[in-house]
UniProtKB/Swiss-Prot annotation:
The gene is fusA. Its main location: cytoplasm. PANTHER family: RIBOSOME-RELEASING FACTOR 2, MITOCHONDRIAL, TRANSLATION ELONGATION FACTOR G-RELATED. This is Elongation factor G. Transmembrane segments: none annotated. GO terms for cellular component: cytoplasm.
Amino acid sequence: MARTIPLEKVRNIGIAAHIDAGKTTTTERILFYSGIIHKIGEVHEGTAVTDWMEQERERGITITAAAISTSWKDHQINIIDTPGHVDFTIEVERSMRVLDGVIAVFCSVGGVQPQSETVWRQAERYKVPRIAFINKMDRTGANFYKVHEQIRDRLRANAIAIQLPIGSENDFQGIVDLVRQRAYIYANDQGTDIQETDIPEELQAQVDEFRTKLIEAAAETDDALMAKYFEGEELTEQEIRTALRKGTIAGTIVPVLCGSAFKNKGVQLMLDAVVDYLPAPSEVPPIQGLLPNGDTIERRADDNEPLAALAFKIMADPYGRLTFVRVYSGVLKKGSYVLNASKNKKERISRLVLMKADDRQDVDELRAGDLGAALGLKDTLTGDTLCDDGSPVILESLFIPEPVISVAVEPKTKNDMDKLSKALQSLSEEDPTFRVRVDPETNQTVIAGMGELHLEILVDRMLREFKVEANVGAPQVAYRETIRKAVNKVEGKFIRQSGGKGQYGHVVINLEPGEPGTGFEFVSKIAGGTVPKEYVGPAEQGMKESCESGVLAGYPLIDVKATLIDGSYHDVDSSEMAFKIAGSMAMKEAVLKASPVILEPMMKVEVEVPEDYMGNVIGDLNTRRGQIESQSTEKGLAKVTSKVPLASMFGYATDIRSKTQGRGTFTMEFSHYEEVPRSVAETIIAKSKGNA
């Protein structure tokens, strides 16, 4: 089957922002104007197409990244609407990994907010080109110019306005297009009566100022244009558009647009900008992957290249298990067998579908650049690579943040026991930031996630989707353990003689602190066969498993590097199990000698309160072991940014309301892990041993 839409006319884009900036409403308007839906759904009415889970429609927030295909001006646009709440950061992360461009939506009143910065950093990590849409221009307090400046200052982006608003708040009437030098007046709030006119005289000076900046930015992308500009020649509309496209795709320019999605103003012009400035799959750098021998290889977005696809999301569905994939090269066909290179297992594609939120359209194949979903994959998880058996390749997986909060769960009745374990397995397959473990001391099932809302929604889903009633304990902090110094030549020796065949395993290791975020790293420097090859893997496995429970308080050990340097074996008595135990013994011994410490999750907390309450808020954050990073006031509103241990933040939502008579708000997101003070460590250790 031949390709129906040329690759250069495909756009894979995401819509991302801080919570409440209007992402889902913007997506709904895009779908309405591109003909996918015939009645506009509203988030506050619980009818948005992309918010299709029950909890999303109830809460008016987007939890999972919904993928939808639509079209605009003979281009196919695949859109992912991502959540803005920090607890669902993995959804944004996995979307960024598979997108070619992003519309970053900002509220014209709130401006650049904490989650806007997080989303921006995620886009930076994957080098995703962006356009900015300053939304809600009809709101009281809307200020396009302030937000434009914040994007430049706080996000350090080369934000170039390609539109200016005509009026704001209740007087927001339309938009000036700085590239075309035309004004668009919206005669009603349905977006159906748009009049193209000359630029209003009172705006001409401002238009001239911003158009000059626009032309300078365009000229800087190309030497020939720069020469033309310096010679005083006018750049044509097409030259400006081509230059802006080049700068946007290179990441050196962020075009800035404005509008009001809710009032249907500016959405069609934004769709034009998606087509004009964001890249096709063939215009982004080829994806890099690893061959089985460890060499790096590039795969271009081309149907004729061998297949390379990344599974970026798993979803339980009444129709079966849906695996969302981005095809980077080649063609993925229904009914074909593919290799899951990450697991080295063959899988069969039984069905392929294109998504229209919770509606789906069966297709025979997905081609290079396509986003779709496959059914029939049993072993594939988020981050796995699917490829041709004859051309194996492993693509870079996703960055999975560590969970920071945990709760114990138990089924309400014995009958729910099996259902609970099935539900937890299914949910953890869908969401890599959701972890499940059984506490070896208490035998309790403990679930961990990115925040209280994250776990609340997962427990809610257990009841709704899996019909499991569960009792949930109080939230617990997900502490970690690590080491502060390196130790050398630590032995682990396991010998057992009890008649018949004995057991013998012996390893010698060096242990040192690893880079933050590396987890457990292992290197073998065995020379001369002191430990045979077949026993190196089991020894590593033993070390890795011992990291699951640290020596101080039983929390997972992270960011350590173990090097196997020596050992010995017995021709008859050595076995894989003996070396696994020896590896575990060496690891425990080494950690005890390497100055182990406990780490706690630190949260970035941003509080906004009326100025009068600023002193109270700062004093309160200090008592919570907070580190104040910045404070500012604007129009009677104080903003305080700090890093605070998660352990001190439970119940803060209630406290801040009572301290500010309900007028304070705050946002909180994970920042990093940090060593706890000695007094706190002693309390944690005593509690873990049952003495507190």
